[in-house]
Amino acid sequence: AHLINFPGDRTEQILLDFLSQPSGEQAVQIAKRKAVEVLGRLGATQSVPVIGQCLESDDIYLVENSVWALQQLKCCDPAIIGRMLSLLQDKSQNLRVLIQCLAGLKVQESVESIRLLQDSENLGVRGAAISAIAQLLNDKSNLGKIVEHLTVPNQMDRQSAVQDLIDANASDFLPAIVSAPVSPAFRMRACRQILNDSDSMLIDANILSLIDTVLCDDPSDIDIVHKYDQQPSVEFLLQDLFSTDFSRCYLALMSLRQCSSEVLWPLMSDLWEREAHNDYGAHYFFMRIFGSRSDWPQDGLRHALEIIQESIINRRPQFRKSRAAAIQALHFLSSDLFINTMPDFLSESVDAPWDCRYMTVMCIENMAEMNLSLKEKILSHFMDDSDVFVRARSEICLSRVRELSA
């Protein structure tokens, strides 16, 4: 796996030589799965024939990774594509990955086989098949069936549904994706990928409102799947913020609104020190809670502001989605501190991601107490931003400010 950090002919040849070695040992088979994946990620097109041979393996996971790699490498070898078409008839294989690959490679010969899988009992296979038909035939009439998968009990099926809509470039269903009970990072990726080819002139207020909704991430905007039979304890709700199922997290976040800040703060403070500070899921939801109310106990508010400021400039990748949430929380709890520290959390030294800059623009726009000329001056700095969505958001904000100034 570390060879991905050393791209080049020598690395690719080492991996190809390794794949050519016959061995039935489990450790070797596992390593071959990774080798195929790395070759795909490296874009090693000369490896296509060797990876194609891996489709004959009895190891279904090696076959799965080989199919994925062949899609990355844009395989057009008729014999290899023919083998993948035949694998569609083998129910022991990962049919979802096969369908995604054949659709991604625009293999028209796969249409009839894939069409039959649109009624599969497996939701992941069914959704991929519907998405593939939309891509191959430009027939989007069945995409609404994938939307139904966005609120099924199993989170993996929900995430698969989002990916299927991304693959089909289903822009009409962006509102449904935005409200799906999956990771906000995944929903945002869907928005950006589907709108990826848009020019800033075409990104209107309606599109930006979807981005705003994901970034603000109010649990009342989420189609929560779960529900409680009776109101759980505060301790239980806080623990649910660690769940790997985002529907449970959003349900807990919504339910915690009924708890007073006096009761909530000591429990949160203790849990933060013990676990939440190092759990990227709970870390994010703690930022949401910090920025959801202004009546924290005085000592709690001071501590929360310290945590928030540290989180804004935390460059560890796993805590990336917390940064914009922390900016919003800081703006809500202390607008003066927000203004005073804004140059620091937007400086090049902390490498502020696009969503942090976007959130800053949103916060500036909402500062009713700020002088309009100062607001216009600050927003103007974002007009040359490298990100198309930040530019579009700042342009809309500026036009609104100038209307008020006129």
What does each model-identified segment do?
Residues A1-G8, Q29-A44, Q53, V63-C75, ...:
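Structural detector for internal amphipathic alpha-helices that build alpha-solenoid repeat scaffolds
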Residues F6-P22, A44-E56, C75-L88, V107-D119, ...:
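Amphipathic alpha-helical scaffolding segments comprising HEAT/armadillo-like alpha-solenoid repeats
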Residues S20-I30, T213-C216:
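Short, flexible, glycine-rich and Lys/Arg-enriched loop motifs at helix boundaries
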Residues S23-V28, D58-D59, D90-N94, E121-L123, ...:
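Short inter-helical turns and helix N-cap capping residues of alpha-solenoid HEAT/ARM repeat scaffolds
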